[in-house]
């Protein structure tokens, strides 16, 4: 036993004498790395963790805090209802609702699972909705009642606007982090969810947003109507987005002496070149995805011979001149149409405007398509928002019936007739869906 221990000792001693320096350096380095690891490891682990996505987005417009863009509001909260792809109202903060037989009373039952961002449950007393000619009554904590003076079938879709408790305390995936104001206007708003922070900055013009992108003040520009002024730099990426809820249209002033003639408006509608031939095409003011859409209306495909035929016998044709008013983003389209009408024998000029003109002969502009097929405010003869000053007793009656009829099948029939009669006597020509652009820094 003693001999064995001596042998092990001599062997160990010989190994240390031979490799002593290596052993010492190994111990020193190991201790150093262990100590360094205590400081470095947490940083390494933090680096491995997924980082929070962070982006600064430029938008055009002078924005008040109570008039934030609807795209931001929908990220922060939801309404009593939501709108599905077909334009129907579906549950939002309310899980269900009922309507009285006379169509004047709506009772909404709130979803008990809905929580405000401050951690409190959504209750009926939190719901602050003020609509003209509508009475609101809190029945109990989970029930709210609306009483209308007249039946209004689209009412549930009206209640899809995002609701807030106090100052922008909502129920959405994103919540407000910071709001920077300059007087009554908002300079920027910061919102965040569990993994992403978005800062929206507001600028007076698209040129200002492009300058901000060049200077590195923002990472992205959202919802540009035109990209003509965006520099073709490699570090910028442009992404188009077609909006199925917006269209570009040619509006006629139907009280203009020349344009009051139905045949003249039809002729001009036929002689608009380069109408889209794909899914961008729009032939009606009601969305193609709507349950009330009528695909069998007169489409006014480009047909010069038909346009000339319709103008035969029109006495003013040799003396009339037309002026198209439009906004800068639609200038090239307006010039294209003006050239076509001039070739048809009707000299046409183009005027660029900065604001919606109170008077015009022809106006080319964009329009938001309502979720519900109700088009009363746009085409009924009594409405100040009827830009074309259109007056058609048959169309008026259909619009009145459409908003007072609760049965969807009957409403569908009414609005299909409305589209057919409107396009037979066109106060407007619907061209195509509007495309906007987002510009990203790569």
Label each residue range with its predicted role.
Residues 141, 147-200, 204-208:
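Gly/Pro-rich hinge or "lid" segments in bacterial periplasmic/extracellular proteins
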Residues 255-291, 296, 333, 422-427:
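Periplasmic-binding protein-like
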Residues 55-101:
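N-terminal lobe/hinge region of extracytoplasmic solute-binding protein
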Residues 96-135, 212:
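Aromatic- and charge-enriched surface segment that lines or borders ligand/interaction sites
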Residues 179-185, 199-255, 366-368:
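Extracellular/periplasmic solute-recognition and catalytic clefts
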Residues 27-34, 184, 312-369:
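Ligand/substrate-recognition segments at binding pockets and active sites
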Residues 192-193, 202, 236-267, 271, ...:
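A bilobed periplasmic-binding-protein/Venus flytrap-type ligand-binding module shared by bacterial periplasmic
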Residues 349-354, 376-441:
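Extracytoplasmic/peripheral linker and loop segments enriched in polar/acidic and small residues
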